């Protein structure tokens, strides 16, 4: 029998030039709350990373808690997420991008599949089709071996519900200067500390792709992957053999 949790879920969303997305984000979280069985509820944390565009702090919802974190400086997406994490009250967190989509059953289904694992990873839609297929098998790619030898199999952080206590200190204490591989750093650090990833076969998440997505910039990606490897090495996250595998994989991905 699947375990039911009653802890609060914090949906953390960095906002950058994205005020237009806020009504959709609130409605999305409210729909998740309507479907969810957890009694403590959902909080939506909007971590503004644009010092030139303040978010109205009086935003209100009848069914969810909304927290607004305005800023005086631009920190970058990883630091904005960590700032949201520090303000979060939830036992579980979801790091959602401002333009991505959670389906109404997301919270309820992810919590019901979590069990004693550290995360629940759901299936998702990418570019109007299922991201996992015969060439990218869901059951095979969400694994430590794949992440170390093949690349990042998780299309976007919002695909994953994370037990808050499982977020690694290496990730929260090492802010990457170049955005792109910060999600990948998080998953690798989690696998290194023995985190368990529960697989949820439900399609609950949609990744929205724009032409200016950072992940599409190969030069930025290369710089970010190199920085990620340096952080992993400097913090002894993996042994020498593991680091050799990861560096080789990064070079192969971009070759």
Residue ranges and their predicted role:
Residues 8-10, 43, 185:
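Cell-envelope/extracellular polymer assembly enzymes that use nucleotide-activated donors
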Residues 18-33:
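Short, well-formed alpha-helical segments that are part of the catalytic scaffolds
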Residues 26-27, 82, 90, 103-115:
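Short alpha-helix within the catalytic core of nucleotide-sugar-dependent glycosyltransferases
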Residues 33, 63-64, 79, 107-170, ...:
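Flexible acidic/His/Gly-enriched loops in nucleotide-sugar-dependent glycosyltransferase catalytic domains
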Residues 45-56, 97:
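A conserved acidic beta->alpha catalytic loop
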Residues 93:
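Short aromatic/hydrophobic "clamp" motif used to bind/position activated sugar donors
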Residues 143-221:
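Conserved nucleotide-sugar donor-binding catalytic segment
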């Amino acid at each position: 029998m699947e375990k039911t949790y009653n802890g609060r879920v914090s949906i953390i969303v960095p906002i950058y030039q994205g005020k237009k997305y806020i009504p959709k984000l609130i409605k999305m979280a409210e729909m998740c709350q309507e479907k969810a069985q957890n009694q403590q509820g959902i909080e939506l944390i909007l971590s503004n990373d644009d010092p030139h565009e303040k978010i109205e702090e009086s935003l209100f919802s009848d069914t969810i808690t909304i927290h607004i974190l305005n800023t005086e400086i631009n920190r970058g997406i990883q630091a904005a997420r960590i700032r949201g994490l520090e303000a979060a009250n939830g036992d579980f967190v979801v790091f959602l991008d401002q333009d991505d989509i959670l389906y109404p059953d997301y919270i309820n289904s992810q919590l019901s599949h979590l069990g004693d694992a550290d995360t629940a990873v759901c299936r998702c839609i990418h570019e109007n089709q299922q991201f996992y297929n015969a060439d990218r098998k869901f059951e095979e790619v969400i694994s430590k071996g794949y992440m170390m030898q093949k690349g990042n199999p998780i299309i976007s952080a919002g695909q994953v519900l994370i037990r808050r206590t499982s977020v690694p200190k290496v990730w929260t204490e090492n802010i990457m200067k170049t955005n792109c591989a910060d999600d990948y750093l998080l998953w690798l650090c989690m696998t290194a500390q023995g985190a368990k990833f529960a697989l949820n076969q439900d399609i609950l998440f949609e990744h929205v792709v724009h032409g200016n997505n950072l992940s599409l910039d190969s030069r930025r990606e290369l710089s970010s992957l190199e920085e990620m490897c340096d952080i992993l090495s400097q913090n002894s996250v993996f042994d020498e053999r593991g680091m050799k595998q990861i560096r080789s994989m990064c070079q192969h991905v971009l070759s």
